[in-house]
Structures are given as structure tokens and as C-alpha cells.
Swiss-Prot record:
Keywords: ATP-binding, Cytoplasm, Ligase, Magnesium, Manganese, Metal-binding, Nucleotide-binding. Optimum temperature is 60 degrees Celsius for both transferase and synthetase activities. Binds 2 Mg(2+) or Mn(2+) ions per subunit. The keyword Ribosomal protein does not apply. SMART domains: Gln-synt_C (SM01230). The lineage of its organism: Archaea, Methanobacteriati, Methanobacteriota, Thermococci, Thermococcales. This is Glutamine synthetase. Pfam families: Gln-synt_C, Gln-synt_N. Residues 11-97 form the GS beta-grasp domain.
Length: 443
């Protein structure tokens, strides 16, 4: 009965005419930030922008040079029914010029490079999340005993998941499949693919609605890559295809097209540095360990879930690749910018993809992987940042934001190392620390 009432509440929401408008953007971490203005200022927000102080936004300017302007993108307007306000994404400017560290602007610039080649990227994400009962401590309370695709033992979680899906269309998302994931209290709601910029917006919107609905029910939802040691981590597999003149250019006859293979080649070539964007937290590397279906070996294959890149289909409009290492702590604008930049680089340079595998990579011994030329992803955020420093192409994707990003993330890594040292915890620990929970639980 409670479940039915919850669903009815979501369906019957009456959305009054919004009197306030949320101007929303992300910081360098991908966390949602914003300010509200009266709806009467909407046109001003589009035409002239609204100024704000960026000095306290993670990854933005210091206090000595922090005057920024938000300009609304009216194509992103939506209404948030549980708050009764409007919401719009946009771009950040510094004076009359696009601000170098604006994540959405970074992706836009990479997409303009694709467009010069006549290409558009379609991307479908699969973000996973956990739902925990609030109890005021870091002793995370698991509210259900379900497993993969289970239909029993879900109690409140099932109601929350359905209510999330019912709210999603208000924000422009089209839910496709809802199901329980492998971990207890772990869930996934897949939504329809879209062009790259809209997909990045949708990921931000999805995380917003998931957290908000869980909160309405007295629960926490977290997209933290590995909230509990020994439990499956939260991934965000990305299904990617490129289109030209309305045709999917990944389609081949007996396999993927050369364009698709070179795109894969570019990703594999830069995968180590790319990890700094697709897996940008200390906690990300607690997920990327063997045994949990999270890829650690740089390889690719057809329908092979142990590979870093899987090819689910190569015929028809559904021809695509699946990049399996990203997690939902990534800033989606930066992650997609990096992936598309290195993929385009692979196409231009005709990079052939090595490390093709048909069998389970995890079951190979070191000698077999070495024979096949299979390398590994970085084992920590620190290693990923060192790879990023050496990779010109991934740095180029970030553009002027590279310094902001590397400085911010190096401080993050240093703080973690200091925490471990102060408690005599080994630097290579795979246990989830309280430092990580405090820093990443709300990503």
C-alpha cells in the first residue's frame, strides 16, 4: 500500500508556475552547483548572464581573480517538480570570453572538433548507485537484501527506484530499464542515449533526481565508486557511437568499421592518462580491482565483459562500443571530452587497436597477458595523475583547465597520503577509509 501511495504521489505532482530559476553548473569534480534567481530575470540570464564569485567553487579561480558570469542555455530548461522551481544549465564566462575551467564549455569545445570532421557522438550511460538508510554514522545501513535482477526482499528500495523513474522525464531523461544490481542495496536505472553534451547534462540531472528522491524517503543515495569494501563498486559504463550525415559510422560488415577500430585504438593508447578523468578519485581505484567485473586490463573484444572495451553490436543502428572503466564520480563533461578527444586522435592517426581478447582476461596468467601486449590501468589516483602529465592529447582535451585540474587533484592525493600516514595505514590499502567516505559519499 505504501509503495502504491508513493508512486501516486510522483505521478500526480502538480507543478505550479515556477517563481524561481536555478542556474546550475558543475565544479571541476562534477558536483552540482548553482544559484537561484527570480524567474523574471531569465531573459537577462540568457542574454547578459548573471555574475558570481567563483573563488569558493572547487577547481575555479582564486580569490584574487574570481569574478565569473553564468550564461543560461535555454535549450536545457526544465522544471524540478519536487521543489517547484525551474532549472537551466549554461556556460561560465570570464568577462566576454568563455571561462577555461568551465567543464561544460570544455566538452563543447571538443565537440566542435568532432563537428569539423562531420561527426556527432551518441552516448548512453549506465550509472550505478547504492541506497542506504540514514543512521547518522559511517556504519552504512543496508536496507535490502536483493541481488542482481531480484524482485523480492527490496522493500522501500523498489518504491524509491520507481519514483525516481517517474520524476526523470520532468528533467528530460527517458528511463528505459530499472533493476537491482549485484550488490545488496545497489541499483541501476538506464536511460536513453543522446548526443554527447545532452548526455553529460543528463548524467548530472540523473544524479540530482536520485539523491533528491532518496532524501524525500529518509535515505541516502550514493554514486561513490566503492562505498563498502568487499561489495561490488558503482560503475558507469558508456555506450558510444559516432554518426555522420545521419548514419552510424561504426557499422561494419564482418565487424566494426575501420573508423570504429581506430577510435578504439585511440582510447586504448591513452587509457592510462584518460583514467584521471574517467576515474578521478582515490576511491575509484578501490573499485578497479580484479574479481568484481570492473576492468583493469587494457584490452578489447566482441561481447567480452572482462575487456576494458566491449563491442556489444556492430550491425545496424545499434553498432557501438562500451567503455567499461568509468565510474559515476567522474565529471561527465570532462570524462566525455577526454574520451572523444583520444578517440578522434585515433581516427586521424589510424591507430590500430592492440590487445584483442576473446577469453576472460582475469583468468590469464601474467605471461599470457604479456604475450598479448595487455597492459593495466593505473592502480591509484596518484599513478593516473602521473600518466596525465605525460599525455599531450588528454591534456589538450582539458585545454586551459589542465592546470586547475592537476593542481586540485594533486592536493586531493596528497591529503589522502597524509591521512594514511597519520594512521599508519599502508598506502596500497584497498579498504575503504573514513577519509574517502567523508570526501566522496555525496559525489
Amino acid at each position: 500500500m505504501n509503495e502504491i501511495k508513493g508512486i501516486e504521489r510522483a505521478v500526480q505532482v502538480e507543478v505550479p508556475r515556477p517563481r524561481f530559476l536555478l542556474l546550475a553548473f558543475t565544479d571541476i569534480n562534477g558536483s552540482l552547483k548553482g544559484m537561484e534567481i527570480p524567474m523574471e530575470r531569465y531573459e537577462e540570464a540568457v542574454e547578459d548572464g548573471v555574475s558570481f564569485d567563483g573563488s569558493s567553487i572547487p577547481g575555479f579561480e582564486g580569490i584574487e581573480d574570481s569574478d565569473l558570469i553564468f550564461k543560461a542555455d535555454p535549450s536545457t530548461y526544465a522544471e524540478i517538480p519536487w521543489e517547484g522551481i525551474g532549472r537551466v544549465y549554461g556556460y561560465i564566462y570570464k568577462g566576454d570570453e568563455p571561462y577555461q575551467a568551465d567543464p561544460r564549455g570544455i566538452l563543447k569545445r571538443v565537440l566542435e572538433r568532432l563537428e569539423k570532421e562531420g561527426l556527432k557522438a551518441h552516448i548512453g550511460p549506465e550509472p550505478e548507485f547504492y541506497i542506504f538508510k540514514k543512521n547518522g554514522t559511517w556504519e552504512l545501513h543496508i536496507p535490502d537484501s536483493g541481488g542482481y535482477f531480484d524482485l523480492v526482499g527490496l522493500d522501500k528500495a523498489r518504491e524509491i527506484r520507481r519514483e525516481i523513474a517517474l520524476y526523470m522525464p520532468y528533467l528530460g531523461l527517458k528511463p528505459e530499464v530499472l533493476h537491482h544490481e549485484v550488490g545488496k542495496a545497489q541499483h541501476e536505472i538506464d536511460f536513453r542515449y543522446d548526443e554527447a553534451l545532452r548526455t553529460a547534462d543528463n548524467i548530472v540531472s540523473f544524479k540530482h533526481v536520485v539523491k533528491a528522491v532518496a532524501e524525500l524517503h529518509g535515505y541516502y543515495a550514493t554514486f561513490m565508486p566503492k562505498p563498502i569494501y568487499g561489495f561490488p563498486g558503482n560503475g558507469m559504463h558508456l555506450h558510444i557511437s559516432l554518426w555522420k550525415d545521419g548514419e552510424n559510422v561504426f557499422i561494419g560488415e564482418d565487424g566494426l568499421s575501420d573508423t570504429a577500430l581506430h577510435f578504439i585504438g585511440g582510447i586504448l593508447k591513452h587509457a592510462k592518462a584518460l583514467a584521471a578523468l574517467t576515474n578521478p578519485t582515490v576511491n575509484s581505484y578501490k573499485r578497479l580491482v580484479p574479481g568484481y567485473e570492473a576492468p583493469v586490463y587494457i584490452s578489447w573484444g566482441y561481447r567480452n565483459r572482462s575487456a576494458l572495451i566491449r563491442v556489444p553490436a556492430f550491425k545496424g543502428s545499434g553498432a557501438r562500443i562500451e567503455y567499461r572503466c568509468p565510474d559515476p564520480s567522474a565529471n561527465p563533461y570532462l570524462a566525455l571530452a577526454g574520451i572523444l578527444m583520444v578517440g578522434l586522435d585515433g581516427i586521424k592517426k589510424k591507430v590500430e587497436p592492440d590487445s584483442y581478447v576473446e577469453t576472460n582476461v582475469y583468468e590469464m596468467d601474467d605471461a599470457e597477458r604479456e604475450r598479448l601486449g595487455i597492459d593495466t590501468l593505473p592502480g591509484s589516483l596518484g599513478e593516473a595523475l602521473e600518466e596525465l602529465k605525460k599525455d599531450k592529447t588528454v591534456r589538450e582535451a582539458l585545454g586551459g583547465a589542465y592546470k586547475n585540474f592537476i593542481d586540485y587533484k594533486e592536493r586531493e592525493w596528497e591529503e589522502y597520503i597524509e591521512y594514511l600516514s597519520s594512521r599508519d595505514i599502508p598506502i596500497d590499502t584497498k579498504k575503504v577509509t573514513e577519509w574517502e567516505l567523508e570526501r566522496y559519499f555525496y559525489v
